[in-house]
Amino acid sequence: MNGIFLVNKKAGLTSHDIVYQIRKKFNIKKVGHTGTLDPFATGLLIILVGKATKLAFLFDELDKQYDGTIVLGKSYDTDDTTGEVINEAPVSFTEDDLKAILNRIVPTYKQIPPSYSAIKKAGVKAYEAARSGKPLDLPAREVSIYNFTYQINKQTIDFSTHVSKGTYIRSIARDIGLGLNTFGALSVLNRTNIDAYSQNMSKTVEDTELPDLIDHALLFEGVKKIVLNDYLIKLVKNGVVLDERQTTLNEPFIVQDEMGNYIAYYVPDNQQYKLKYLF
C-alpha cells in the first residue's frame, strides 16, 4: 500500500493524531503527512502511506486555500483564540480601513511567523521557546496572498484566502488586527484546498477506506517518461546517476522499463540526473 489518503480533519485532533489513526486502522507502519494543521483547525490533510512517505517533497511548494474567522479586540500569545489573552483594545474601523490593510499585504508582504510555531532558530523550535517564556525573535519572511475575500460582522471578519506555501493564517489575523489599530486573532480555520486537492475529495478517518487510497504512481501523471533497457533498469534500482547518454531532459522524469512499469523518479542535478524516488 503506497500512496496518499485525503483526510478531512476534525477540530480537536492534531495532525499526528490523524497519522496514528490511519496507521492503526489500516495496520500500516509507515505513515506521515505533508503539512500540519493546528489542533483547532479543520479541513484537508494529505496523509502519506508506505513508500509514499518519501514523497513529501512533491507537496512542499503547493499553494493552499482556507476559510476562517478573525476575532478583533484581543490578542493571544498563540495568535489564535486557543491561547492566553495578553492584550485588549476597542474595535472601531470602516471597510475602507480594512481595504487599506489588504492593499498592503496582498499580493505579497513580509510576514513574521507566530511565536507558537514549529519554525526553528539555532536548533530551537519557536513554540518550545515561547512555552518557556523566552519567545524567539523570528525574522520576517516574504509570503504571497493571491486572494482574500471577506465579510465583516461587527467585531469578526469571515474570510476566504489563497496563499503560498509557508504562509501563516494566524499571522494574517494578527496583522490585520494591528493594521486596524486594535488586535486580531484567528478563531476558526478550515483548509479547503492544497493545490488541486480539495476538501470535497476528502473523508474523515472513520469514513476512509482502502479504495480511497490514491496510488503513488498517479501523483506523477503529468511527468515526462523515458524507457530504459533491462540492464540499465538494474542499475537504476541501485541508485545509479543518469546522464546525457540516457536523456537530455531538463526537468524531472519517470524511468519506465520496457513493459511500461514505473521504476524510479529522477531530477536534474548538475548536468546529470539523480534518483529521487523508487517505486
UniProtKB/Swiss-Prot annotation:
Q: What EC number(s) does its UniProt record assign?
A: 5.4.99.25
Keyword Protease appears in the UniProt entry = no
Q: This protein's superkingdom? A: Bacteria
The answer to keyword Mitochondrion applying to this record is no
User: GO molecular function of the protein, one example?
Assistant: RNA binding
Pfam families recorded: TruB_N
Instruction: Give GO BP annotations, semicolon-separated.
Output: mRNA pseudouridine synthesis; tRNA pseudouridine synthesis
Tell me what reaction this enzyme catalyses: uridine(55) in tRNA = pseudouridine(55) in tRNA
Ranges in a coiled coil: none
> Which UniProt keywords are present, listed alphabetically?
Isomerase, tRNA processing
Q: Which residues form the active site?
A: D38
Q: What class of enzyme is it?
A: isomerase
**Family statement:** Belongs to the pseudouridine synthase TruB family. Type 1 subfamily.
What does this protein's UniProt record list under function? Responsible for synthesis of pseudouridine from uracil-55 in the psi GC loop of transfer RNAs.
Report the protein name in the record.
tRNA pseudouridine synthase B
Species this protein is from: Acholeplasma laidlawii (strain PG-8A)
Give me the gene this protein comes from.
truB
